[in-house]
Amino acid sequence: MKNLIAELLVKLAEKEEESKELVAQVEALEIVVTALLRHLDPNTQQTLIASVEGALEGVQPESNVPQRDTELLQQYVKKLLRHPRT
């Protein structure tokens, strides 16, 4: 029983480490995208935003992807493009 608990704790620690790495990757990408958007002139920025939003509208998720996941992705992309980090 102790071995099982120890294995579960090790797996939990590994998952937590993976989660931290993913959070760091997402934050790094958010910083890069924000910096890139800020260096574009307003017309180019709006063209890029419209292009990304248009591409998302034209894509249908696979049936096994929960609707909530799709909505979260769309909301986050919109937030990132329209209201980047300050």
Swiss-Prot record:
Statement: the UniProt record of this protein carries the keyword Coiled coil: yes
Keyword Coiled coil: yes
Primary residence: cytoplasm
Location(s), subcellular: Cytoplasm
Gene Ontology terms describing biological process: cellular response to starvation
Coiled-coil residues: 1-36
Keywords carried by this UniProt record: Coiled coil, Cytoplasm, Stress response
One GO CC term, this protein: cytoplasm
One Pfam family recorded for the sequence: Anti-adapt_IraP
Family of the protein in this entry: Belongs to the IraP family.
HAMAP family linked to this entry: Anti_adapt_IraP
Subunit annotation: Interacts with RssB.
Function: Inhibits RpoS proteolysis by regulating RssB activity, thereby increasing the stability of the sigma stress factor RpoS especially during phosphate starvation, but also in stationary phase and during nitrogen starvation. Its effect on RpoS stability is due to its interaction with RssB, which probably blocks the interaction of RssB with RpoS, and the consequent delivery of the RssB-RpoS complex to the ClpXP protein degradation pathway.
Protein name per UniProt: Anti-adapter protein IraP
Originating species: Cronobacter sakazakii (strain ATCC BAA-894) (Enterobacter sakazakii)
Gene it is expressed from: iraP
